[in-house]
Amino acid sequence: MPAQTRIIHYYVCLGAAGGKEWKVNMNENFEYKIATREDIDAIVQFLARDYYETSRALKDPCKMIFLAYSGEVIVGILELLDLSNISFVYVSEDYQDTLVQEELLELAERFVTKELTAYTDEEHLSFFKQHDYVVDVESNSRYLLKKTIPVLPRFSDYDQVLEFIEAQKDRVYSLTNFKNFMYDFYDPQTKLTCVHIGGTNGKGSTTNYTKEVLKCAGYKVGTFTSPALVNRLDIIRVDDEPIDETTVVRYANRYMDDWMAYELSKFEIEVFIAVMYFIEQGVDIALFEVGLGGTLDATNIVSPILSVNTNIGLDHVKFLGNTYASIARSKAGIIKRGIPYMTAERRPECLEVFYEEAHKHHSYVIEIRKPKRVYYGASISYDYHGYHIDLSTSAHYQVANSALAINILEYIRKEFPFKDADLEKGIHDAVWEGRFETIHQNPLIIVDGAHNREGMDAFFESARDFSNIKIIFSALGDKDTHHMLETLLSLSKDITVTQFDHPRRATAQQLAEDFPVKIDEDWKHAVEEAYSHKGVVFITGSLYFISKVRQYILSK
């Protein structure tokens, strides 16, 4: 048999389950769902005995299992391996003459972007042939069957897809369309084991620390983070490798009509692609970073084993409110029924909101404490929960982020075991681009994505350890730039404000108003001038801004 058949583990069969008898209404409607771990007992009962090894199959990240229900009774099951291979089909004998078999096959085909295969015998060959499967390989009365899924080639390259996605409207006031889309798509996100990480600052760093430890322990980890620092593909990664352009084109050609029908936003499309890609790649765990707020964020369709809040800051006040309590309520929107909510936030008004929302959802809050003894220098070290932690950064704010990651890891350790050495090595090895990152020596140039009041305050704590400082600053117009510049002026009087191409940018003139700073509307010119500085150059104010600067400097 050819190499592609090696992953077909189960004999594809259509037959009775343990001799049970069912009264069948030939006109009845059937309901379908993607199986979760809560369905284990029902599946075992349906199959009469657990020769299917249900528990292990449901935990296998490469397998997606579909169930057919008649009322509250399972009558059919189909397993899809790697989103490309039908590896198990089982339908109750009394439902052989209904549409269950056909509808299970059609359901599987919705999740396939190119080609679907199955491996069967002579007895069931005709069934698959009736549904346009063709024999690819025959060996010892066993058949490898293939069916090509018809897809219109609307996009020929990634640039076309990116242009299409960018053209979709942003929507932050409602999640209804996306929830309906995912529901009608049988909620594939429920297949993923994931952690949902929100908060104002530190989400990306916390995600990165968590990912690195899990990777050290041998797990395959999917991460969804935003915004992208270098390339838009970077927001979706598996073990640090971004999704490739060809895969995005494949998904776009397959699902564009569905995206358009439900009027999905750019971010919603990207979340859907991430979900499908993580399933296809068979990740052991997925880490989803909230984009904006929580309640109405597109990532809020996931079903996490843990929800996390890094902290609360006054950011995106136009959408989330202008008080800590109102922002906390939006962030707490990711709390799920029965799922704990972990937070490093200490403000009483925020914690009050968290406890209130957790109570509504029959959940509970896990408050974490920061390390007490921290040793600062060119790198940072501390002892925490029995671990000795060495950070490969001088950014003070990474103490809180790494400590939160340690608490996340300890919470999920029962399901994802790791050694203490894995944690210490992973935390040390973790490097997060754009967060107090040195990108040039002589002069020393450090970029930092501080982009709001609290982020700039945290940046200040690390930057004040330096002397002879020059700063290049730019920001979006909806940020508290007045506070950020006041903070930066306490570090240095040598500040150049500039501007970059972004629809929400603040102009250099707007930033400079009321402040004794230099103005240079050409950010590249400002960077070139900074090369003659004899001390340290900090470039900060916006993740979007430093992504451009970072790429420019590193490409030289």
Regions found by a protein language model. Name each.
Residues 97-110:
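Conserved acetyl-CoA-binding loop-helix of GNAT-fold acetyltransferases
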Residues 280, 285-288, 298-308, 312-316, ...:
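Nucleotide phosphate-binding/pyrophosphate-handling subdomain across enzymes
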Residues 347-362, 376-379, 444-445, 453, ...:
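C-terminal helical cap/extension that packs against the catalytic core
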Residues 270-319, 351-388:
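Extended acidic/charged loop-beta regions that coordinate divalent cations
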Residues 172-175, 179-191, 216-302, 320, ...:
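ATP-dependent carboxylate-amine ligase catalytic core
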Residues 111-123:
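Conserved GNAT acetyl-CoA-binding A-motif
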Residues 122-142:
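Conserved active-site alpha-helix within GNAT-family acetyltransferase domains
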Residues 150-199, 206-208, 212-217, 224:
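Short functional linear segments
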